[in-house]
């Protein structure tokens, strides 16, 4: 076996090692493969260029060419998929690697349809979990990793502190230690050739010497106090946290400090490919001082981003900038325009869910009024698109990217099967072109492979080629994950998804979409005090047990470790679903006290067994967001 790296970059060295390792597994160490890894244009290796790979291999001999080093790595994994490999999830026993004689012809010329195929850091993680996930991303077709914040201490501490898990001992994590983990994550991202993005929320107070660690959660430095947003007659922390606190962005001191900080930051980290610039998280936290009230928040925001752009350009720094349409900046600026529009692509959250998905329908009615610190939710997906259309017309920026939240917490309503989540996400990716969008940034847990990884697997496949058929992708995934028991497994998960149905447990909200505002009339749980739903939930335990009994008989003869791991996950998933159904049953019968007891049992089981599904299931995010804050929120 001779794998020749003609590019000799860090990424192609990794690609060479990966191809050599897998081919040795498939055909033995002494196989006759002769493959050259090359650039399509030997004079260009730009990580920002669109991905294209050309594979021309016959009987194990030929070339894999790419438009950049990352594209060559993507081409390596595409060739391995052609040979029958399947990359189902991160970690040991997460992939199918069949034996092969490497004979036959592989001719593929693939250009990624969507240039922005982005995964965003969320959930509870450590650097090892993230690096394992990063290894999986190019196998799934993604090209960019976005680390929120300069140092994502908030996500790392959730893991190290083992928040919500009484069975684990908290581990201290200083800001400096989190910064070291961040550097390791950044280095590995670059090794893979993935575009590396940073920031998002959480940069405003860094120029004032305040990081976003525990020391500065709800207090201000003396230097910062005079410069925070003036709201209701005072300047103070908003929402109890500086992460929810804006500055006065018309204040010349603030503007200069932020601009100077960006120059310093990108000089320190010239390897960053992009920075996402978002104002503070939260709502109703924009400055109401006399000067700020002269302009819209979006006009002030564009002026700030222009100042950052000009200063970076003067220093010869050409890192891409990604402004974000978010809360008060949903409305397009009235006067300000980006002076250098080719430097920007705009990130835009979209109001959607796993039932409706994206829509190409035009917004009907009157859009919400833009009134300072009087937050109104975006009514629906067409309204989100109207905001984007207004920004496109006002700024001249061509590239818009959806910031998608399907796999942040909404997918937990489909935790029984993930079938609805997978189909909706795949359909949404196909709709991007009709909506004029250039890709997706998935704001999601890094551990979304429980009970399966079909939603994010299908998303990656569709972002590369939206003409693929979802049914083909689903069958490909299930056959690899569950072997000859794939059909029975799909039927089982589909049935579970019918019993703990996305719509049956999702909050119902009536929304007025006229009059220039969105008024929530009422909000009720469909399953509370609903004996008919109780009858449905009561079927879950027997459904799980009957399937696992059949699956265990099948597993007696199954030898593949990856397939066995898939069924291990289904076992724990089934046990969690039984306990979830028991809690839902008591709530449906109107037994609130007994429901609360069952919820406690559910939480306990999830946390006690966390190590059993560590890489596949974000127990922290599921318990905090879905159980504690949504479905079983006290008082609901």
Q: PLM ranges: what are they?
A:
Residues 23, 429-431:
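Cysteine-centered nucleophilic/redox motifs
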Residues 7-8, 27, 49, 113-380, ...:
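Aromatic-lined carbohydrate-binding surfaces of glycoside hydrolases
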Residues 19, 75-87, 449-464, 477:
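Short, Φ-rich (hydrophobic/aromatic) sequence segments
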Residues 471-490, 590-591:
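Carbohydrate-binding surfaces of carbohydrate-active enzymes
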Residues 516-636:
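Histidine-centered catalytic/metal-binding microenvironments
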Residues 1-113:
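Contiguous, structured surface segment used for ligand recognition
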Residues 27-33, 268-272, 314-319, 553-562, ...:
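Surface-exposed helix-capping loop/turn segments at secondary-structure junctions
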Residues 383, 432:
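Aromatic-rich surface patch/π-platform used for binding flat ligands and interfaces
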């Amino acid at each position: 076996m001779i794998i020749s790296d003609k590019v000799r970059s860090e990424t192609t060295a990794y690609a060479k090692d990966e191809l050599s390792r897998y081919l040795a597994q498939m055909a033995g160490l002494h196989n006759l493969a002769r493959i050259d890894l090359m650039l399509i244009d030997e004079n260009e290796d730009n990580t920002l260029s669109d991905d294209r790979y050309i594979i021309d291999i016959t009987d194990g001999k030929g070339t894999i060419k790419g438009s950049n080093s990352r594209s060559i790595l993507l081409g390596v994994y595409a060739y391995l998929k052609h040979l029958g490999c399947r990359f189902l999830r991160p970690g040991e026993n997460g992939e199918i690697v069949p034996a092969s004689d490497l004979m036959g012809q592989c001719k593929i010329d693939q250009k990624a349809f969507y240039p922005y195929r982005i995964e965003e850091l969320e959930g509870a993680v450590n650097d090892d979990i993230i690096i394992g996930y990063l290894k999986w991303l190019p196998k799934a077709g993604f090209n960019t990793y976005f680390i929120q914040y300069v140092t994502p201490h908030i996500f790392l501490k959730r893991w190290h502190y083992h928040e919500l898990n009484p069975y684990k001992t908290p581990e201290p994590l200083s800001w400096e230690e989190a910064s070291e983990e961040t550097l390791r994550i950044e280095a590995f991202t670059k090794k893979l050739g993935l575009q590396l993005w940073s920031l998002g929320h959480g940069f405003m107070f860094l120029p004032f010497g305040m990081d976003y660690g525990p020391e500065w959660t709800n207090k201000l430095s003396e230097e910062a106090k005079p410069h925070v947003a003036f709201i209701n007659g005072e300047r103070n922390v908003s929402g109890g946290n500086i992460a929810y606190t804006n500055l006065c962005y018309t204040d010349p001191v603030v503007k200069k400090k932020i601009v100077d900080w960006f120059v310093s930051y990108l000089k320190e980290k010239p390897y960053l490919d992009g920075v996402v610039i978002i104002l503070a998280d939260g709502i109703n936290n924009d400055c109401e001082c006399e000067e700020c009230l002269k302009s819209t928040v979006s006009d002030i925001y564009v002026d700030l981003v222009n100042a950052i752009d000009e200063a970076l350009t003067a220093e010869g720094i050409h890192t891409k900038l990604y402004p974000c349409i978010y809360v008060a900046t949903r409305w397009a600026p009235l006067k300000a325009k980006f002076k250098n529009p080719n430097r920007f692509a705009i990130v835009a959250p979209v109001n959607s869910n796993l039932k409706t998905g994206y829509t190409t329908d035009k917004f009907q009615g009157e859009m919400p009024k833009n009134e300072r610190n009087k937050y109104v939710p975006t009514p629906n997906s067409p309204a989100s698109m109207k905001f984007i259309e207004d920004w496109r017309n006002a700024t001249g920026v061509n590239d818009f990217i959806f910031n998608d939240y399907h796999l942040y917490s909404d997918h937990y309503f489909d935790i029984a099967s993930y079938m609805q989540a997978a189909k909706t996400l795949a359909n949404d990716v196909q709709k991007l072109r009709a909506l004029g969008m250039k890709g997706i940034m998935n704001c999601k847990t890094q551990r979304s492979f429980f009970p399966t990884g079909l939603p994010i697997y299908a998303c990656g496949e569709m972002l590369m080629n939206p003409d693929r058929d979802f049914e083909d992708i689903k069958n490909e995934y299930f056959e690899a994950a569950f072997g000859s028991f794939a059909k029975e497994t799909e039927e089982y998960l589909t049935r579970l998804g019918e019993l703990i149905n996305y719509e049956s447990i999702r909050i119902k909200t009536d929304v007025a979409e006229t009059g220039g505002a969105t008024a929530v009339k009422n909000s009720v749980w469909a399953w509370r005090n609903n004996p008919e739903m109780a009858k449905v939930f009561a079927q879950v335990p027997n459904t799980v047990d009957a399937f696992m009994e059949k699956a265990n008989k099948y597993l007696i003869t199954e030898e593949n470790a990856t397939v066995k791991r898939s069924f291990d996950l289904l076992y724990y998933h089934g046990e969690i679903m039984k306990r979830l159904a028991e809690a839902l049953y008591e709530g449906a019968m109107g037994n609130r006290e007994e429901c609360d007891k069952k919820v406690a049992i559910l939480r306990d089981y999830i946390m006690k067994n966390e190590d059993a599904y560590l890489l596949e299931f974000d127990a922290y995010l599921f318990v905090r967001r879905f159980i504690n804050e949504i479905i079983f929120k006290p008082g609901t």
